[in-house]
Amino acid sequence: MLNLIKKEIALCMHPTAFIFLFFAVLVFVPNYPYEIIFFFSCLSVFFSCMMTRENGDIAFSCALPVKKEHIPFAKMLVVFGLQCIILLLVGVIGAIKGAVLPAEQYVNQAGISANLVLVGNGAILLGIFNLIFFPCYFKNPDKIGVPFVIGAVVIFLLISVFIALRWATSLYSTTLNGLNSENTGAKLVALVIGIAVYVVLSAVTCKLSMKNFQRVDL
């Protein structure tokens, strides 16, 4: 499994998978829908799967002395790792922003502020994208566009919901917005819920994707 993961990183990861990690600094952009940052992580998955297809990596991997179900599992583990890194970076850089900027400049007028709740929201977005994209992709690894478009549409709809909640509910506009030092307990609960959703959805994603890939005739 470790060798498969190394192979994924060396041969299948598109450069954008690493470049887009630096987009976490977008939390310093004032009045910006920060959930968009996580869409770029989804976009890097699309580019990496395209690279996998163009390099004929699936057929190559199936010729290796490994279990067939380990092939999708290794790819997803690499993606999950990169997603956890972007979540961590957004949380850390958001905390730095809160420490160096005045409170009135920290509050985001275009959505939730760069706090723990944003990380929880991002975890939910990434988990849902994984659940939509990977099981469909591993049914037919040559067909990448449709699963990605469906996943992207759902992601942007959810981002719109998060933005609407920022203005429609006092929970999002007051309690969950602003600095982490304000209403910390509520923000931690939102973070834990988001991470829990991500873990559950990722586990389901792995199970469905591995099952679907077993049926692929290469």
PLM regions: where:
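Alpha-helix N-cap/helix-start motif at helix boundaries, enriched for small hydrophobics
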Residues: H70-P72
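Juxtamembrane/interface alpha-helical elements of multi-pass membrane proteins
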Residues: F60-C62
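Hydrophobic alpha-helical transmembrane segments of membrane proteins
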Residues: M1-I58, A74-L218
